[in-house]
Amino acid sequence: MESILLEDNPHWNNLSAYDNFISRELLPKAVSYLTTKQILALIGARRVGKSTLAKLMIKELLKTVEAKNIFFINLEKPEFIPYKQDASYLAEIFDNYLKLANPNLSEKIYFFIDEIQIFKNWEVFVKSKYENSNIKFIITGSNSSLLTSDFATVLTGRVLKISVHSFSFTEFLKFKNISYGSRIEQISNKIEISRAKDEYLKWGGYFDVISTDDVIIKKDILKNIAEDIIFKDIVPRYNIKNSSQLKDLFYYIVSNATSSLNYLGLAKKINIDAKTIKEYINYFEDNFLIHTISSYHTKMTEQIKSAKKLYLSDNGFLNLGINRTINNGVMLENEVFVVLNKFCEELTYIKENYEIDFRCENSLYQVSYNIEDEKTRQREFRAFENFDSEKKYKYKLITYDETSL
C-alpha cells in the first residue's frame, strides 16, 4: 500500500513534480472551486485529461498548502481490483495515507480520488468524511450517471460539476506553439493556423492523438480509446452479454454521425432490436462516446418523442467509420456540435420546411463547409427566416473559413 501511495503522490518529495504538465483552459475555473465546501466532480470520457487537470490543480495548491495535506489516489490500479465491491476499503486507503504522510490535521486536507466509479457504493464513504471532517474532495469519473443515480440519494446538493473534454482548438494551437491571440498573429500565422485547423477537424483533440504525426498510430489510439470505453466501462457496468454487437453498433453510428436516428429503421439494417439499440445508445451517451439532440418543439412531450440526431464526442472518432471517406461537411458540423455542447444548456435542431442545424438559447446556427455559391447562401438564410418570422433569434452561418452573423 505504501509504495502505491508514494507512486501516486510524487509531490510529497518533489514540489516540481507536475511542472511539465500542459495547462488546460479549465484550470482557473477548477482552482476557484477549491475554496468551496462542496465535493468537486471532474466528469468526462476516458483519457480526456481529468487526471492531468487534477494534478494541475495540485500544482496550484502547492503554492499555499503543505504538500502532505494533498492526497491523490488512482482507483484504477490493478492492486485495488479485488476490493472494488467493498467501499470500506476506501477508508483503509485514507487511514494508510494518514499514517504514511502524517498531514497537518489542523489544516484542510485535499483528497483527490481518480476514477471513483470503480468502487461500488463509494458515495457512502465520501459522505461520511464530508460531513464530519475538514476534507475537500475532488473526484473524477468517466460516467455521467455519477451525477444522477449515485449522487441522487446520498450527495444531493453537495456536488459541483466540471465537464472535462479533449483539447479545444485553441488549446491545440497552444500545444502546436502557434500564436493566434492578436490580429497580427492571425495574419502572420495564417498558413500554420489553416493547417492546424485541417488536422484538428480530422483528428480531434485527444492528447495522445495530437502527440503523434503518424496517422496509423493516431487511428490505433482512437480505436483503443473507444474500445476501452466499450469493453472496460460499458460492458461490465451494464452487464452486456453480446459485447461484439455493442461494438458493431458503435462503429455503425460513427459511420452515420450527424444523421437522424430512426430506431426501427436501424434495427432492420443491423439486425438488433430497436429496444436494445435505444439502450445501447443511452450507454454510449452515459460514457461520453456519443451525444444525441432532439428536434425543437414548443411542447416538451413532442421534443422528447422527436427523432434524434447523432454526434460524436470528438472528431477523431470519425476516422473509425466503416468503409467511409470522411465528408468535410460532416467534420465541420460535428465540431460545431462539440463546441456548442460545452456551453449550451439545451441544444436542439429544427426540422420544419427547412432544417436548421442547431438552436441554442436565442441563436440559430447553420453549418455549411463553404457558401461560395450564392444559391447555397440564400438557401441557408432562407431556413432562418422561414422559422423565425418574428426575428426573435440571432442568426449564425458557420463555414470552414468564417462565421457570418
Predicted features along the sequence, with ranges:
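Conserved lysine of the Walker
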Residues: K50-S51
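Walker A (P-loop) phosphate-binding loop of P-loop NTPases
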Residues: R47
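A short, basic N-terminal segment
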Residues: M1-T36
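Short glycine-rich substrate-engagement loop in P-loop NTPases that contacts/grips substrate
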Residues: F72-E107
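Interdomain motor-coupling "hinge/lid" segment immediately C-terminal to the ATP-binding subdomain
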Residues: E2-L6, N13, S144, S149-F250, ...
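Accessory nucleic acid-recognition modules appended to NTPase machines
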Residues: E2, N69-F71, S211, V215-N362
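Hydrophobic anchor at the beta1->P-loop junction of P-loop NTPases
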Residues: L42
